[in-house]
Every structure is written in C-alpha cells, then in structure tokens.
Amino acid sequence: MNTDNASLYVKWLKQEVAPALGCTEPVAISFAAAYAAQYLDQPCTKISGFISANLYKNAMGVTIPGTTVCGVPLAAAIGAFGGDPQKGLKTLEDITPQHVEMAQKLIANNAVDIAVEETPDFIHLDLTLSAGDNCCRVVVKGTHTNVVELYINGQPQPLSEKQNTRTQRETLPTFSLQQAYDFINRVDFNDIRFILDAARLNSALAAEGKTKKYGLNINGTFSDAVKNGLMSNDLLSKVIINTVAASDARMGGAPVVAMSNFGSGNQGITATMPVVVVAEHLGVDEETLARALSLSHLTAISIHSRYTRLSALCAASTAAMGAAAGMAWLFTRDINTINTAIINMISDITGMICDGASNSCAMKVSSVVSSAFKAVLMAMQNSCAGANDGIVCADVEQTINNLCRLVIKPMTLTDKEIISIMVAK
C-alpha cells in the first residue's frame, strides 16, 4: 500500500492511543499544576485561575487516581504537590497519601480558587501557582497536555522545542472507514505491533477492576448475576463484564494505567476490551488481534475526529462503534458487515449524553458495548437499519457525518444546559 498513507494511520494511532493514569480531565488539571510547580523553589501556597466549562464537567465528580477523593481543587493541589509533568497523562503515577494530605490542607486554608469560564477551546486551563514571592502561570488548551503559554513572575517564557514536542499534537487529515479497513488488511504486522500494548494495559486494568469494589462495581453486579443464573455466561456477558471491569477501575481511581483513545481512558477501554474478548473466544494469533485492534481504534478516531474532543455526546458510544468494527472484522473480515454494524449502532444509541466523568460512566460503557455486540450480530445476518430510519442512511460515511452534525450544532446547547445543572448542584 502507499507508504505515505500507511504512515498517516500509524501516526494517528501513536498520537491518539496513549497510556493515561486516571480520568484524563482531572489529570489534565493535575498536569497543569505540576507543570507550574516545577518552576517554584518551594511548595506552593496558593493556586488560582480558571478552567473551561467542559473540562469542569468531566473533572468534578470522578475519583482522582491513587486516591479516594474527587474534585477540581483537589486535582490541582495533588498535582502541585506530587505530580510529575514529564509523565504527561501519567503525571499522578507517583503520588502518595502525604501528597493528598498536603492538598487537603491547602484547600482547608482557602488557598485554592479555580473558576469555571466559557472558552472557545473545550479544553482550556489557566492556572497560577504561588510560593513566597514567586509565581508561575501555565496555560494549557486544545488537548490535555498542550502547554501554550508559560509565565514566571509575570514574565513570558519561551517554550523549548522539547516541551512543544512533548505536549503538542500534529494536525492530521481525517480518513474514511474504508481507508482504515484497507490499511489494517495490508500493513506489515511489525508496523502495528505496538497496538498490542492496548490489549495488555487495558486487560490489566480489567483484572484490577475485579479485585475489589471500584466505583459502582458494575462488573461485580453482572458477575454475581451470572453466578446466580440471572445472566448467561456467554460471549456477550464476557464482553460486557471485562470491559466494564476496566471502566469501574478507571473511574474508581485505581492506580493502574489505561490505554486511552482520543484523550479518554474510557474510550480506549471501550475500543479495546470487546475486541480482546472476542479475539480470545476465537483463538486468534497476535497479528490478527493487532489488526482488529488497529481497525477498532482507527474507526473510533475517524468518527471522533469529526466532532469536538469534548461534547454533550457520550464518546464511549463512538468508541464502541470502533469496537463493533473490530469485532465484525474478527468474525467476517467483510467491510459491508462492518459498515452495517456501525449504521445499526448509530440508529440505536445516538443521543446518549455525557453529563461528566463519574463512576456511572461504567454503566454507559456497559450499554454501548452491548449495543456494539448486538449491532454486529444483526449485521452478520444482513439486518440493517433502513435508510428511511431517522438520521441513518445507506452510506456509512454520511450516517457518521449526520451523527457528528448533531454533536457540533444542536447538542452544543444541550452541553451548556448540562454544565449549568452541574455547576448549580
């Protein structure tokens, strides 16, 4: 295949499928605070600034990794005392209970004041950390670790080439599902072998989620239902339980890294675990799994790149469309089955809202992976939502564009109302 095109898809995968510790919105706040703290010569005594409304929505209610606490002020303060900005989305990997205690004391002293503001960028943080006579201000926007401005004691500082390389994402052209399908069928296995890390990391997270009650423990509820004969111990149940176990752990603050997709751990989990479970069921080799995972993650990327990084739409739903593509490919290798499965999913779960990251996200994950599996089964029987059914049409690309049109236009008002409700709580 064209090596330039192959390079594009590998770039997309390496850029958007990345390890992350904890829900990425509170981690982004911790990262910004940690980034500023490294320029202070003593522990910070004050944190101030603002974050975008969408960032607030996804940071206020989810457990901060390695802790049992949540909240925007705590995310900032914990990052300031224990974060390592060199680790990007894994910035909280080395925090300790002492860091949490220091953060709680700072908040108790009313020394953390972070406002919520409407900004053009859905991801926007502007934090200033002070210690003694010194202060450092950091501005992050566009993506979770994209540092665009740095000020020390009010003076702007140049961002080094190393800093820019670490934090900025390359703007890459979008692509169709057919192009992704062609790529994963033709690419050399060694060029995509790295995607197996997604299976390794997210499977480890799922295993952690089964060790104790994280979040709402939805995987435990379903596992008990299987034991008690209320659910079947079939492939669908295994897909749901293993995917939700990782999401439970993720949202419940497990100190275990996830492989994310498009800046979201839950999206990475959703695009990975159903494919892993089906691959294990079919007994395929690593190369086949790598191709299926690449298709799943590329499909999720192709869809999400057509709408905003944060929105009123639950993005686990579009990540699950990637999982549907990966599962359909494992079962059939047929592009028409893949396209049909995605059309079926859009007919099924369009409109599931994102009302912020929280433990209940795992419930949404269980819903979307169930929809994905159902859509694949229907597609394998040549059963497809009709072109006259709502927003779907015969062409999968146009159907995806119709979905994204809803997200970009009318659902922006939905998003504002959701945030308004949450801020008023």
UniProtKB/Swiss-Prot annotation:
Molecular function (Gene Ontology), one example: L-cysteine desulfhydrase activity
Listed InterPro entries: Ser_deHydtase-like_asu (IPR005130), UPF0597 (IPR021144)
GO biological process, one term: L-cysteine catabolic process to pyruvate
PANTHER family for this protein: UPF0597 PROTEIN YHAM
The family this protein is said to belong to: Belongs to the UPF0597 family.
Name of protein: UPF0597 protein KPN78578_43500
Organism the protein comes from: Klebsiella pneumoniae subsp. pneumoniae (strain ATCC 700721 / MGH 78578)
